[in-house]
Amino acid sequence: MLSSTKTQGKNLMRLPVAAALVLAGVALFAGTATAQTGYVGILGGGPVYKNDDKTNIKELKTAGFTELLVWSVEVNASGDLNLNGEFPLTSGGKYIGDQTWPKFAKALKNIKTGKVTRITLSIGSSNVGDFQNIKALVDSQGTGKKSILYKDFAAIAKALPIDAIDFDDENSYDEESTVQFALMLGGLGYHVTMNPYTNNTYWTSTVSAINTQMPGLVDGIHLQTFAGGQGNSPCSSEWDFGDVPVFPGLSDQPGAPPFKTPTAAEAQLKTWHSQCGITGAWLWIFDQIAGTDQVKEYAKDMTKGVNGE
């Protein structure tokens, strides 16, 4: 995906941890992939948390979108999490987001009292480093309860109403560490989604490996069909993830072509629904249309499109 506003375990010693997470998570996630009915989502950055007047929160709560993707979480070399390089979320495995934006947790909870039923935290972007750091941390510490990644996401789970973690890896593509990281998240109660734009063989293999060990953990694919993903189709065989539904992402931003108006988005989604029965989609990016009537227009028209109306 476009850059943010600031522009495999390696040995057998990890197997007991992975196995424990699988045993803990299978009952939780079994069958959820086929039960997935789809979401119409919107991805947003700074405007989701920089909101003293509550206008953006009200828009997101009432517009009609059913999923909010909060983007982009950066993972530094020590394992600390930060939104867009300007909003520290964790330090040393403890949640510190309330020090910068104390109303963030309350705002997300408020959003979920409206139309939004799922909040997803998206990691990565076109920036190099996030998933390389995750790989290094998994290699050095594993994913057990004493690891920094486990502590980070346990702290996030306690502080914020996050349902899923989205993997927007655009340059690391290490299957082994990604699988271990995903299984850890599943053990903590999260679902996992993927956010690809290229390298389909990596993504299909990784999703298969994850869901083989913890069925239903990966329950959606946020496929980019704009910018670097221009030309991608959720109906293409190269993006076939079996029982895991593919939700195409459309762009409201002229700088991330092809730009789609609400009406054009509806038409495109209706075509894909007719071709392969898509049940969901998502919009890049809330930041472009925050404070305008287009938020509701996109939600309404995209919902009609994925329903084939």
Describe the residue ranges of each PLM region.
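Bacterial N-terminal signal peptides
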Residues: 19-28
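Short glycine-rich, acidic/polar surface loops and turns
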Residues: 268-270
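Fungal secretory targeting signals
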Residues: 14-18
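N-terminal secretory signal peptides that target proteins for export/translocation
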Residues: 1-13
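Sec/Tat signal peptide C-region and signal peptidase I cleavage site
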Residues: 29-35
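Chitinase-like catalytic core of GlcNAc-active glycosidases
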Residues: 36-266, 275-278, 286-308
